[in-house]
Every structure is written in structure tokens, then in C-alpha cells.
């Protein structure tokens, strides 16, 4: 654990277990691998063992965005004028209680391993730029982005040549990535050839898709328990749901063009591929949800009909009674004019 000061702002950083706290951490930034303009640059550092870490943050005392209005109504959280939670962090050494630190912020930073292959994917699809994740539903101009990128990635290059090319044509901070770390990333998303003992690499869309399929399979096998699943769905639909969710979890790490290439993947019968059928999973889940919506609509109509029928106190069905109006027919006797009848003379006044 260490405390850094950048631009007058103190940061509490939880370091990896294998990192020596006595050493200085030199961090650098790279563009977000998803090429989403609304996302900040990612902050990285590489330790002496060649492991690459990303510095991420977590803030206590701040609810999720979807419950912001409810939290305000319940007075659950309190914020400053800058919309920061009014909280402090206490760091205490359990072995020595006199050794402690008070941190006037509820935000802590932690380190997680980062795969440089995702930044290489972002470089390959550097023309596929999106404003936010909502743009991923639109597949327009994806083909043009792939075409324009492929023109500049047709050559096989050595690791050192790729290192120089990335530094000069993508971002200058690529110079902070070691050749060994870059080599491990290139091996995951590139085709390779060997000549005179030297290995040459060329990033291709096919290799990128294969790399991402491996990530999807790994997420499906170790599906996060925090993500709700379909409880009453058939087993095959549950599996499709996991594949769809695992694919969508990669949105924050890959450009839109790479995402749409992944959506169209479907293994052939003779390939012997064990990767999930992404395309079929999306189609089957969508068809199931559509059918389920129709069934729910029919079920709702039946429920409304049952509610209209109702039950009486004895548990018997009480059918709705129609109000019947009985019409009384009145017999109207015809009036006889005076002096016209045959018996009128008998009752004649004298």
C-alpha cells in the first residue's frame, strides 16, 4: 500500500503482493482499448518481473447512478459541492496502533493485471471510434474501418519494429512497454513467420477474434455469480444467455468493429472448433425472449379474465350476472265513444 500525490491530489493505492513498496512506481497512460472517446486513458505500470498492472479506483459512500434520486430522497449519502462523498479513510497498522494515516477521501485505488493484447486490438481498429457503448448497437461503417486499418497492417514486423511503429504512429507512451511484454501480447493476436531465426508478427482480425473467443469461453466457464441468470429458462437457453452476457462484458475493452466481428462468429461443422457459437446464441436468445413476451401477454389476458370472473366467499366461481330489465306489457282497452254502443240507451239518464 502506498500514498501518491499527483497534481496536489493524494491517492491511496493498494499494491500487488509481490511488489516492493520501497521502490518508486512510474506510471504511464495509454488510450482506452475500446476507443470510446468518453472513457479516460488507462493508467499502467510494469514491475521488475515484467507484469503489467492497471491502476483502477473504487469509491466508498457513493451509490449507483440508477438509485441516485432514491438515495437523495432517503438522505442516504452526503456530498460536497464537487459531488464527492463526505467520507474519510483511516489506515491503521494492526501490529502498531500508533502507526496510522487519515486520508480525507473515500476513493481508493487498486491494481489489477492488464493484458496488453487489448491495447494492440485498440491499435489495430484505431479508426473504429465510438462516443459511448450505445454506439455498439449500430454496425454502420464497421467494414470501412476494417478496410482502412488493414492497409497499414499488411507487413510482418519484428517485436522491436512493432515497438517503434506503435510509439511513432499510435501513442508515444508505448515506449514504456517492455519488449518482452509486447512480445507476449503480439503472440496472442498475430500471425507469425520465422526467417533466419527471427520471428515476425502481423496482427489480423481472425487472430483477434480467436483471442476474444477464448475470453468469452473463460467467462462462461467461470460465470460471475453477481450477474443474475434466467431461472425458468431451458438449459440450452441459459447457456446462450451466458454466452451473450460474456460477449457484452467485453464491450468496455474492445472497439466496436472487433465487437461486431465477434457477433458474426459461427464455427463450421468441419472445423472441430470448441469455441461457443456467438451468432447462434444471440439469435436463439432473442427468439426465446420474443416468444416468452408473447406467452406473458397471453398469460396476462387470461389473468385479467380470471380476475373479472372472481371467486365468492365459498371459493366458488361467481360468473358475472347480466342485469335483465323485465318489460311489463300493458293491455290498453279501446275507449268507446258515448252514444255509439248498443247498451248505452239502457243506462241513459231519465
Swiss-Prot record:
**Pfam families in UniProt:** RNase_H2-Ydr279 (PF09468), Ydr279_N (PF17745)
Keyword annotations: Nucleus
Skewed-composition ranges (Polar residues): 134-151
Disulphide-bridged cysteine pairs: none
User: What GO CC annotations are associated with the protein?
Assistant: nucleus; ribonuclease H2 complex
Q: Which InterPro entries does this entry report, sorted A to Z? A: RNase_H2_suB, RNase_H2_suB_wHTH, Rnh202_N
Q: Where in the cell is it found?
A: Nucleus
Q: Where is this region: Disordered?
A: 134-153
Q: Which CDD domains match?
A: RNase_H2-B
Tell me the protein family, please.
Belongs to the RNase H2 subunit B family. Highly divergent.
Q: How does it assemble?
A: The RNase 2 complex is a heterotrimer composed of the catalytic subunit RNH201 and of the non-catalytic subunits RNH202 and RNH203.
Tell me more from the record.
Present with 2340 molecules/cell in log phase SD medium.
Role description: Non catalytic subunit of RNase H2, an endonuclease that specifically degrades the RNA of RNA:DNA hybrids. Participates in DNA replication, possibly by mediating the removal of lagging-strand Okazaki fragment RNA primers during DNA replication. Mediates the excision of single ribonucleotides from DNA:RNA duplexes.
Protein name, entry field:
Ribonuclease H2 subunit B
- Say which species the protein is native to: Saccharomyces cerevisiae (strain ATCC 204508 / S288c)
Amino acid at each position: 500500500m502506498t500514498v501518491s500525490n499527483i497534481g496536489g491530489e493524494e491517492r491511496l493505492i493498494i499494491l500487488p503482493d509481490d511488489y516492493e513498496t520501497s521502490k518508486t512506481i512510474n506510471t504511464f497512460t495509454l488510450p482506452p482499448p475500446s476507443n470510446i472517446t468518453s472513457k479516460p486513458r488507462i493508467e499502467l505500470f510494469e514491475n521488475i518481473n515484467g507484469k503489467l498492472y492497471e491502476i483502477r479506483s473504487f469509491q466508498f459512500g457513493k451509490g449507483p447512478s440508477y438509485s441516485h434520486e432514491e438515495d437523495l430522497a432517503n438522505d442516504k449519502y452526503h456530498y460536497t459541492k464537487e459531488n464527492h462523498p463526505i467520507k474519510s479513510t483511516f489506515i491503521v497498522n494492526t501490529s502498531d496502533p500508533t502507526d496510522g494515516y487519515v486520508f480525507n477521501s473515500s476513493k481508493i485505488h487498486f491494481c489489477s493485471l492488464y493484458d496488453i493484447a487489448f491495447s494492440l486490438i485498440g491499435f489495430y481498429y484505431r479508426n473504429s471510434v465510438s462516443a459511448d457503448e450505445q454506439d455498439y448497437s449500430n454496425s454502420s461503417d464497421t467494414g470501412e474501418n476494417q478496410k482502412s486499418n488493414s492497409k497499414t497492417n499488411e507487413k510482418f514486423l519484428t517485436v522491436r519494429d512493432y515497438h517503434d511503429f506503435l510509439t511513432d504512429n499510435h501513442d508515444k507512451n508505448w515506449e514504456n512497454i517492455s519488449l518482452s511484454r509486447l512480445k507476449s501480447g503480439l503472440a496472442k493476436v498475430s500471425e507469425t513467420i520465422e526467417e533466419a531465426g527471427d520471428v515476425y508478427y502481423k496482427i489480423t482480425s481472425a487472430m483477434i477474434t480467436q483471442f476474444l473467443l477464448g475470453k468469452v469461453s473463460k467467462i462462461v466457464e467461470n460465470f460471475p455469480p453477481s450477474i443474475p441468470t434466467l431461472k425458468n429458462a431451458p438449459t440450452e437457453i441459459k447457456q446462450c444467455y451466458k454466452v451473450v452476457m460474456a460477449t457484452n462484458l467485453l464491450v468496455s475493452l474492445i472497439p466496436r468493429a472487433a465487437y461486431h466481428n465477434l457477433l458474426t462468429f459461427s464455427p463450421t461443422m468441419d472445423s472441430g472448433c470448441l469455441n461457443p457459437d456467438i451468432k447462434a446464441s444471440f439469435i436463439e436468445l432473442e427468439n426465446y425472449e420474443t416468444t416468452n413476451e408473447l406467452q406473458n401477454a397471453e398469460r396476462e389476458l387470461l389473468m385479467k379474465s380470471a380476475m373479472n370472473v372472481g371467486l365468492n366467499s365459498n371459493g366458488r366461481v361467481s360468473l358475472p350476472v347480466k342485469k335483465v330489465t323485465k318489460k311489463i306489457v300493458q293491455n290498453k282497452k279501446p275507449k268507446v265513444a258515448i252514444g255509439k254502443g248498443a247498451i248505452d240507451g239502457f243506462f241513459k239518464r231519465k
